């Protein structure tokens, strides 16, 4: 039993046109795969999945997915949102199998942001989520990024972060040392630059 549950139905009407029709009927398309079983295309009520993921913890916890009465434990693998309005357009779930590693996205929590700001810096959050690989039992609620010692010009990469025990950063494992955040000098408006030149 998990703290998070979600209902879904098997979807047979596939394709872009079908996905558009689904969204017009206030549902969204989704897929669940992994666990040595075939992938299933699903339909989920948009309001239900939106409510579930209002709780940030749902991104990094096992979810009991009820597909037409058949229950399976999953974690969210990826989620597509509308670029302007932010609502969920599509979700990918991966089945949880004891003893097997899975990949999932977990939120990033930035702490001590006031330190570089006091030094005159501005912070850019490059990543709000990080993809990790681990067993379900080791899945962290979030990845903490401490900006307490950051100076202007500091770029924090994945390699600067300490992964929790049993957890691997997927991008880093593939040689992609992504930037997670950076601290830069305040941007000067063009008018201010012209005034300073005079």
From Swiss-Prot:
The keyword Disulfide bond does not apply. The keyword Ribonucleoprotein applies. One of its GO terms (biological process) is translation. CDD domains: Ribosomal_L25_TL5_CTC (cd00495). One of its GO terms (cellular component) is cytosolic large ribosomal subunit. InterPro entries: Rbsml_bL25/Gln-tRNA_synth_N, Ribosomal_bL25/Gln-tRNA_synth, Ribosomal_bL25_b-dom, Ribosomal_bL25_C, Ribosomal_bL25_long, Ribosomal_bL25_short, Ribosomal_L25_dom, Ribosomal_uL5_bac-type. It holds the Pfam family Ribosomal_TL5_C. SUPFAM superfamilies: Ribosomal protein L25-like. GO terms for molecular function: 5S rRNA binding; structural constituent of ribosome. Keywords: Ribonucleoprotein, Ribosomal protein, RNA-binding, rRNA-binding. This is one of the proteins that binds to the 5S RNA in the ribosome where it forms part of the central protuberance. Belongs to the bacterial ribosomal protein bL25 family. CTC subfamily. Part of the 50S ribosomal subunit; part of the 5S rRNA/L5/L18/L25 subcomplex. Contacts the 5S rRNA. Binds to the 5S rRNA independently of L5 and L18. PANTHER family: RIBOSOMAL PROTEIN L25/GLN-TRNA SYNTHETASE, ANTI-CODON-BINDING DOMAIN-CONTAINING PROTEIN (PTHR33284), RIBOSOMAL PROTEIN L25_GLN-TRNA SYNTHETASE, ANTI-CODON-BINDING DOMAIN-CONTAINING PROTEIN (PTHR33284:SF1). This is Large ribosomal subunit protein bL25. The lineage of its organism: Bacteria, Pseudomonadati, Pseudomonadota, Gammaproteobacteria, Pseudomonadales. The gene is rplY.
């Amino acid at each position: 039993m998990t703290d998070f549950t979600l209902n879904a139905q098997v979807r047979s009407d596939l394709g872009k046109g079908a996905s558009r029709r689904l969204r017009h009927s206030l549902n969204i398309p989704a897929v669940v795969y992994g666990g040595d079983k075939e992938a299933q295309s699903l339909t989920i009520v948009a309001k239900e999945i939106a409510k579930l993921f209002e709780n940030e913890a749902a991104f990094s916890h096992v979810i009991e997915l009820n597909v037409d009465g058949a229950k399976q434990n999953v974690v969210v693998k990826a989620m597509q949102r509308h670029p302007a309005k932010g609502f969920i357009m599509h979700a990918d779930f991966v089945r949880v199998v004891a003893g097997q590693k899975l990949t999932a996205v977990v939120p990033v929590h930035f702490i001590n942001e006031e330190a570089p700001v006091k030094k005159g810096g501005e912070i850019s959050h490059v990543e709000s989520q990080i993809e990790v690989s681990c067993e379900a039992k080791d899945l962290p609620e979030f990845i903490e990024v401490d900006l307490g010692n950051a100076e202007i010009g500091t770029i924090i990469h994945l390699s600067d972060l300490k992964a929790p025990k049993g957890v691997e950063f997927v991008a880093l494992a593939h040689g992609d040392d992504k930037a997670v955040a950076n601290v830069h000098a305040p941007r000067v408006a063009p008018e201010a630059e012209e005034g300073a030149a005079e």
